[in-house]
């Protein structure tokens, strides 16, 4: 029989001396009441994760819920641009206030704290993770039904901080239709499982483009493997979003709240089910 190392986190056995895993979750600001927190993650960049975060917040807002977006992608923030927000966040002695979009979606991003939104954020990992904690603890979010946390790609400091610090109720994994993506998605899924974070499902972005003449679906990035990946991990495919030039136009113009289409309705339904 092997000797006990007293490291219960890496031990798969049950015994009388076993201790519960440490809980590192931090409370939100005392003036905040946030019902559900949904992380939007990806194994790599450039898959449309921020777009998905923004669109989901818009959809839930349209359904009558008070929604918010915490932009945890500190070194590559794009949420304010999608919503056309350029003003700086303000605060008082109680804390910092998020900036509201045209339709009332609350947003907090490092870009809203900079004098010039084009200035780079050149910080090391611990400082970046600390900024994410501050967005959670020091921002006065008030009453929020659904908060979407737009995370940077990969499985580094920020996802780890979010999973440990925030009471994440579920995550959406965003991917593109390439065989290589299956390995990258697997990393994100396995990290969530290691951290005991529920996975709502997979959103495939840039799945196809519809021919404007005949309506035929053309797989620009090759055959999709999302169904195979989802089956491997016993997860639902929440959406297969097409390449839609209108979405790109809305994003570039800072008018993501004007998007049309039912691409993400399945993902929105999964989020809404968290309240039931």
Language-model features and meaning:
Residues 36-74, 189:
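Walker A/P-loop phosphate-binding motif and the immediately C-terminal alpha-helix
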Residues 114-162:
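Phosphate-binding/switch loop-helix module in NTP-utilizing enzymes
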Residues 139-140, 159-180:
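Inter-motif core of Ras-like GTPase G domains
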Residues 34, 45, 71, 79, ...:
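Residue-level signature of catalytic and energy-coupling elements of molecular machines
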Residues 29-35:
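Phosphate-binding P-loop
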Residues 66-67, 72-117, 129:
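Phosphate-binding loop that captures ATP/GTP phosphates
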Residues 108, 132, 151, 164, ...:
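Glycine-rich phosphate-binding loops of nucleotide-dependent enzymes
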Residues 1-22, 189-276:
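C-terminal lobe/tail of nucleotide-utilizing enzymes
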């Amino acid at each position: 029989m092997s000797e006990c190392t007293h490291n219960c986190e890496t031990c798969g056995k049950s015994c009388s001396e076993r201790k519960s895993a440490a809980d590192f979750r931090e409370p939100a600001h005392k003036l905040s009441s946030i019902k559900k927190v949904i992380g939007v993650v990806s194994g790599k960049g450039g898959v449309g994760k921020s777009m998905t975060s923004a669109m989901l917040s818009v959809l839930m807002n349209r359904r009558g819920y008070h929604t918010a977006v915490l932009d945890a992608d500190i070194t590559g923030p794009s949420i304010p641009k999608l919503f056309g927000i350029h003003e700086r966040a303000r605060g008082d002695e109680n804390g910092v206030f998020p900036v509201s979009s045209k339709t009332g979606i609350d947003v907090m991003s490092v870009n809203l704290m900079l004098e010039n939104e084009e200035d780079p954020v050149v910080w090391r990992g611990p400082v970046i993770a600390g900024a994410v904690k501050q967005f959670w603890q020091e921002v006065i979010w008030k009453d929020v039904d659904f908060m979407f946390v737009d995370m940077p790609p990969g499985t580094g400091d920020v996802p780890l901080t979010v999973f440990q610090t925030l009471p994440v109720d579920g995550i959406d994994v965003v991917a593109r239709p390439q065989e290589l993506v299956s390995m990258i998605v697997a990393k994100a899924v396995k990290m969530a499982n290691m951290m005991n974070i529920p996975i709502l499902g997979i959103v495939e972005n840039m799945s196809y483009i519809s021919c404007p003449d005949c309506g035929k679906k053309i797989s620009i990035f090759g055959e999709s493997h999302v169904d195979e990946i989802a089956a491997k991990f016993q997860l639902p495919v929440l959406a297969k979003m097409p390449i839609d030039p209108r979405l790109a136009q809305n994003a570039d113009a800072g008018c993501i709240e004007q998007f049309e289409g039912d691409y993400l309705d399945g993902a929105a339904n999964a989020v809404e089910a968290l309240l039931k």
